[in-house]
Amino acid sequence: LFHAARCGLGALGVITKVKIRTVPAFSLEQRTTVEPLDGILENIENEKAANRNFEFLAFPHTSMALVVRTNEVDPSAPLISAGEEDPTAIFQIRDAYQSLGVLPLVGKFAYQKIIDSAADGAATVKSGPSYTVLAHDRVVPFREMEYTVPAEAGPECLKEILATIVEKDIPVIFPIEYRYTQQDDIWLSMFSQRDGCSISVHQFADEDYVEYFAAIEPIFHKYEGRPHWGKLHTLGPQEFSNLYPHWQDFLSVRERVDPKGRMLNSHLKHLFGLGGSSHA
């Protein structure tokens, strides 16, 4: 039961008590830059080895990415504030891009220039207690699809996604998130028994996402991606049985602790092959 409940999808009952092993408080420094994507991917293994946390956001229809490197620093080091972020910035970029919709080539050129200009600036740096550096406000409403592919497949998967966006001329400017996580032994974890590269595609909540996500999801499938349980995807029990070595073990535990399915909603029934709907 413990192995199943560590990622139980809310299907195994109500957890009333949790004991967590912690580490001593620590401080972090986070450096954010805009850099050419090709150089990042060529040096990806060194970046993973050199940084405590390494991630980037690739800008569709451009050759650039926003790179975030986070590392531990001495807690006594001076605090550095990165200043206030402008939560409307991405909307301003979208408005500028869409205002040139009648001239799509001009719009893409202007978008590339906006991103290129950001690359000319100095790195943004902030430091302090870990909980102040790692936490970010999310004020832009969006829909998201996230898959985790084997770590070694990450670069090729991302390249194919970006190429598909260009080939199909998908009008998206929302950055694509890319990050790594080490493997674990949790039955239904996206990182179960393999190091993972998580890649997320987003679309503004007030824009249609269906066609975009439908074009990208088969690429994740090609690279044996596992979808984030709390985000949009179209997979069902057959796919999960192939993606998770302990899928049947989990189903057996679920049947034993909740034989009448009292903890299941329509979405969970679909995931477990018990009918229901594919939408939460």
Predicted feature locations:
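Noncatalytic alpha-helical scaffold of FAD-dependent oxidoreductases
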Residues: 1-280
